[in-house]
UniProtKB/Swiss-Prot annotation:
Name of a matching Pfam family: Proteasome
Signal peptide segment: none
Predominant place of localization: cytoplasm
Ranges of Low complexity composition bias in the record: 244-260
Membrane-spanning parts: none
Protein name: Proteasome subunit alpha type-1
Gene name for this UniProt entry: pas-6
Role according to the record: The proteasome is a multicatalytic proteinase complex which is characterized by its ability to cleave peptides with Arg, Phe, Tyr, Leu, and Glu adjacent to the leaving group at neutral or slightly basic pH. The proteasome has an ATP-dependent proteolytic activity.
Region Disordered, residue ranges: 240-260
Superkingdom: Eukaryota
Complex formation: The 26S proteasome consists of a 20S proteasome core and two 19S regulatory subunits. The 20S proteasome core is composed of 28 subunits that are arranged in four stacked rings, resulting in a barrel-shaped structure. The two end rings are each formed by seven alpha subunits, and the two central rings are each formed by seven beta subunits. The catalytic chamber with the active sites is on the inside of the barrel.
Gene Ontology CC annotation, any one: cytoplasm
BP terms from Gene Ontology: proteasome-mediated ubiquitin-dependent protein catabolic process
Length: 260
């Protein structure tokens, strides 16, 4: 993308009906390290690839708990992601104070949509350069909600955002019929296999660069410790990687991938 006379502010439309500032923010999301979210009847899982700036730095946090029944993963500008995660935490706390119960995930998604949309409409603001996946469980079941800087908020069975996320979505599309009845362990393996497909052939997942969050029926949101992550990665290692990152490996639990 190159600078032009229509990208000076978020309120300026191009003759083609585009908001270039919003498109630039979406590109920032696409440059972030990938994250994957999928759900079954009873659980929702988010996994994320953490990056380290160099060999001397720690890996950046990508998954946050926002309430006992929900968590988020982010792709894009991490500083923007932290602001939005804190906003969602505040929304959850306010709802609990007012109504003495956990906020419904759909209400949380609506609040996020309004927050994102305001920065695409008013002069002097810039869109958030981050995409967020919300994983939650409430009386309506498990939820995966995808958001992006354009304020598009969508409920998904499975999705991925960030760099090379199309490879992960290909895996998810081929295995979507297996998710609904999956156990929590199988769901995590599905998510990790999809995340692995976003990596170049010479790289692999490990306990240091992988975050896993899970929430479900009678199970509060939790971030897995490195030792627990390593156990699931050992299961993933039994599934061979396909050439070029294409998602065609056999599904966990013995099921064959769905052909699209």
């Amino acid at each position: 993308m190159f600078r032009n006379q229509y990208d000076g502010d978020v309120t300026v439309w191009s003759p083609q009906g585009r908001l270039h500032q919003v498109e630039y923010a979406v590109e920032a999301m696409k440059q972030g390290s990938a994250t994957v979210g999928i759900k079954s009847e009873t659980h929702a899982v988010i996994v994320a690839l953490k990056r380290a700036q160099n060999d001397l730095s720690s890996h950046q946090k990508k998954v946050y708990e926002i309430d006992t029944h929900a968590g988020v993963s982010i792709a894009g500008l991490l500083s923007d992601g932290r602001i939005l995660a804190r906003y969602l935490q505040t929304e959850c706390s306010s709802w609990r104070w007012d109504y003495k119960q956990a906020v419904p995930i759909k209400k949380l998604a609506e609040s996020m949509q309004l927050k994102l949309q305001a920065n695409t409409q008013y002069y002097g603001r810039r869109p958030f350069g981050v995409g967020i996946l919300i994983a939650g469980y409430d009386k309506d079941g498990a939820h995966i909600i995808q958001t992006d800087p354009s304020a598009e908020v969508v409920s998904m069975h499975g999705t991925s955002i960030g760099a090379r996320s199309q490879s992960a979505r290909t895996y998810l599309e081929r295995n979507v019929d297996n998710f609904e009845k999956s156990t929590p362990e199988q769901l995590i393996v599905h998510a990790l296999l999809a995340l692995r497909d976003t990596l170049p052939a010479e790289e692999n997942l490990n306990a240091q660069n992988t975050s896993i969050g899970i929430v479900g029926k009678d199970s509060p949101f939790s971030l897995l410790e490195d030792a627990q992550v390593a156990v699931h990665l050992n299961q993933v290692s039994t599934h061979p990687r396909t050439t070029g990152g294409a998602a065609a490996a056999a599904a966990p639990g013995g099921a064959e991938p769905m052909q699209m």
